[in-house]
Amino acid sequence: MTINDQRFLMLLHRAMPNACEERRPPRSSTTRLVSWGIAVAATVCALFWGIPRLADPLARLTPVQWEAAFGQHVNEAFVQKTPMCRGEAGGAALQSLTERLAVTMPTGAPFTVRVHRSPVVNAFALPGGYIVVFQGLISAAQSPEEVAGVLAHEMAHQVQRHPLRGLVHAMGLRMVSGTVLGGFSAAAASGAHLGEVVFTLSYSRETETEADRVGVEMLNKADIRGEGLIDFFTRYQATDEVKSAHHGVKESVEDQLMSFLSTHPPGKERIAAIRALVRGKGDALTAKQWKALRTICDENTP
């Protein structure tokens, strides 16, 4: 393998000082076999150990244009699998809320937020400013401030480039599995597959704390009550067992909500930390806008 990117080589050398040493070609079949085994072991170690360490710096080095194009590809593939809700009034209400939050950030990057028809109570950010919100989350929310809190949290993940960092980390591990088991298929690399990877990403405690802080900061600057995120987290905190979304159709909204909580575990300390940051006092949407958003998937539009 030949690598010419000097910044990547520098990062690789920092993570694995011995990975870039020059080796002489093997002189016998036995030597070749041993060398091949060492190479495979080194590759496995690099991807399981080196990629996680390199995920953050590699994500920071990725050009914004590349990230946006990548996110668009994943988003388009995901849309083909899960139909979008196209209610015009609801879409306008969501766009208004999104823009109100986006202008609080200095990045100026646009956000594209879409609601998808699914009972799953979840939302997640894709690279490049794309955010997927499931119908089930809007149905489970008891106020527009709860939706605003979740939306601000996911937008904060994107501002900090957490989805891209998570994909660099996760796909490094999957690449090893594909190689060892017989090849990394095109299907595994498809946008739809990557969308599923993002959907199941579980961020670290530090990453979630960062998204909480930035998300509440957005709510404060937009003068939106931040208690919505707290209410959303605490309403089902007493549930003992967290259930993931892929276990089938849920029997209740409470069970469906566990999908979101499984990737965003609240915890009493985390909720207290969020509460200490809340400063906003205003409404997220008008009563008319909230009604429109609640029925965004009910309207018959082309």
Language-model features, listed with the residues they occupy:
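A Zn2+-metalloprotease active-site environment signal
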Residues: 4-9, 13-302
